[in-house]
Structures are given as C-alpha cells and as structure tokens.
C-alpha cells in the first residue's frame, strides 16, 4: 500500500463536494491504516461533525489520549471501533506489534469516564476482533472484556491473508477443503455453529450500562463458510471510498493493489479507481457511466462463483481480479461480499 495522509486543502475540497449528496448521513474514517495518526485527524473530525455528518472511525486505541477522547465526545462522534484481538497481553503484543493492551483498555475507560462526566451517550464503543488460529481461544473471553469497558458490541471478522504464512492463520472454510471446521460445515451454518465451534457461552449477552439505561451487548460473528449468497454492503449502502490521495474507489477491497491468498491460491488484486476529487468532483465521478454500470453489476451480483468452480485451480483469471464472464474488476471471490471479512 502507498502510505500518506490527505492534506487539508484536499479534505476541504472533499467536504465542499459532499454537499452535492443531500442524503449522505455518515462518514467513516477507516480502511488500511490508523485514522488518528493523521496530523490533523481531530480537526478533520470536528469539521465533519460541524457539517452535520454522523462520524465513526476505526482505531487501534493507542492514540485515544484524554484530549483526543474529549474531542471525539465534543464533536459528537457516533461510534469508535477499537481493534482488540486478544484479552491476553502476550498474545496482543504478538498481533499488535508495539501495542500494549493495558494502555488501550485504559484509553477506552478514560473515554467512557469522560462521557459519564459530560452526561452524553456517544461515541458508542465497539470492540473489533480479527479471528485467527492463534487467537481463537481468546474469542470466548471477549464478552467479559466488553462488559468491563461498557461496549455493547463485539464485531468479529476473519483474516484477510496477504501471504501464505498469514493464510495458515485462516479459520473460515472453503468448499472442498473443510479444514478444522468439520464435514458438516455447509449443513450447519450460522450462529449455532459459531457458538459450537468457538466455545462461546450461550446466550452471549451482557449488560452495557450507558448513564440511565442498559443496552444488552452481543457478539456479531462473521460467516465462517463459503456460500452462494453474496452481498456487497459498500454498493448496497451507496458508499464510496476516498483514499488519502483523493482517488475514489467503490470499496475497501479495490482501493489499493495488493496480494492475498485464497484457498492456497496466490491472487493479485489491482486497484480500481474511478477518478480523483482533486481534479474532478465526487458527484461527477459517482455518475460516470462506468461507475453506474459497475454498481448495477454488483447489486445484481452478475459474477461467477469462482471458489466452487471445478476448474478454478487451472484458471488464470482467478490469479487477478478478473473472471471468465469478462468482468474486470471481478467481485467473484470477494471475501467482503461473503461476509467472511467484515467492516463497520
């Protein structure tokens, strides 16, 4: 991935261009990287909130200082998703190199304490957990941590493996290759199987206290098997992704060029960019015939199902994001559309 941060002149241009979308309600700061590492992150959040947008963001939690927490609250940020992949400090350090679990938990508690002092409900705290072979034993412990920090939701996602080594950590199931998930994986999908597989307590709920009322917390599990049902939340929710350099992409999965491994198959994804807000308006980009046609194809999911095709091991199309129906890019084996990899 190309590293960088959006300069404020470009951000102000984006903010002005968003006025062309009167039905736009939410702006989410996330993707690949840490939003709060931006040198003007808090100013960006304030400007978005002042413009009337519901703001949410992902963070690893290390930069949620007391000053940052106060800004998040005062700006009316709706949800903060904290990435926590373990409740064990040693496991956490292996996954989040350079991070300290105690520091992240302390930062969450500071945020919650400030909310209480200021008598406000937002931002809600959600814990995001990337499920892997090496931390699967930590998943049943997440509801307890969520209860302690006042989080009403634990959002679980599978790993997007960028290398063969990372692929060894994958737990979701692939047709014809039912690793540890068991022979009955296709016959027993859903929550019941998730509880059985990962030893979560039943029922998985906890009280998340917010001032004068109580929300019942829950774990939102990802899909753990490959299936024929596919849905793109990015397209169906009328979302677009704007990179730090102003480039516009339909989704996280196509915003950069990168390798990943799927069913022991190396795949190269090429970025799919429809334009750049620095040189043309987001409204014009959104209404380009190419973009309109792409959204139509994805809404109707006019793509083959590559993963359960008997010839996929000998198909050159599957090595890149193309397919035998002539789609380029192709969303045929997108992990997001399967609900296997999930984003807020």
Which positions does each model-derived feature cover?
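Conserved Radical SAM active-site core
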Residues: 1-56, 62-75
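Radical SAM enzyme [4Fe-4S]-AdoMet core and its adjacent flexible, acidic
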Residues: 1-2, 6-12, 51-54, 74-280
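Structured loop/turn residues at beta-strand edges in well-structured enzyme cores
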Residues: 22, 75, 149, 304, ...
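Short beta->alpha connector loops
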Residues: 35-36, 60-64, 86, 131-135
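Short glycine-/acidic-enriched loop or helix-start segments at secondary-structure transitions
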Residues: 38-41, 67-68, 91-92, 166, ...
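Flexible mid-to-C-terminal extensions adjoining Fe-S/redox cofactors in radical SAM and related proteins
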Residues: 247-248, 253-344
């Amino acid at each position: 991935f190309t590293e960088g941060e959006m300069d404020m002149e470009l951000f102000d241009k984006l903010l002005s261009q968003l006025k062309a979308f009167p039905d736009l309600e939410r702006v989410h700061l996330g993707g690949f990287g840490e939003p709060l590492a931006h040198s003007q992150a808090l100013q960006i959040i304030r400007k978005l909130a002042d413009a009337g947008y519901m703001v949410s963001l992902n963070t690893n939690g290390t930069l949620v200082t007391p000053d940052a927490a106060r800004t998040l609250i005062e700006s009316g940020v709706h949800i903060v998703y904290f990435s926590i992949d373990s409740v064990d400090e040693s496991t956490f350090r292996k996954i989040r190199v350079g991070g300290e679990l105690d520091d992240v938990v302390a930062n969450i508690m500071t945020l919650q304490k400030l909310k209480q002092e200021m008598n406000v409900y937002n931002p809600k705290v959600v814990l995001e957990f990337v499920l892997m072979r090496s931390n699967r034993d930590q998943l049943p412990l997440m509801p307890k941590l969520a209860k302690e920090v006042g989080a009403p939701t634990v959002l679980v996602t599978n790993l997007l493996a960028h290398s063969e080594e990372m692929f060894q950590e994958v737990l979701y199931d692939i047709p014809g290759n039912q690793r540890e998930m068991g022979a009955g994986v296709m016959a027993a999908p859903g929550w019941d199987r998730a509880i059985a597989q990962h030893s979560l307590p039943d029922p998985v709920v906890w009280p998340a206290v917010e001032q004068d009322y109580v929300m019942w917390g829950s774990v939102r599990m990802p899909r753990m098997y490959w299936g024929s049902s596919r849905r793109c939340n990015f397209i169906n929710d009328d979302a677009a992704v704007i990179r730090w350099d102003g480039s516009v992409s339909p989704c996280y999965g196509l915003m950069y060029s990168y390798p990943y491994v799927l069913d022991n198959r190396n795949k190269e994804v090429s970025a799919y960019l429809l334009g750049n807000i620095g040189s043309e308006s987001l409204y014009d980009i959104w209404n380009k015939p190419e973009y309109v046609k792409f959204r139509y194809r994805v809404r109707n999911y006019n793509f083959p199902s590559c993963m359960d095709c008997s010839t996929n091991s000998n198909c050159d199309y599957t090595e890149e994001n193309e397919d035998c129906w002539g789609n380029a890019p192709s969303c045929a084996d997108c992990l997001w559309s399967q609900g296997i990899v999930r984003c807020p």
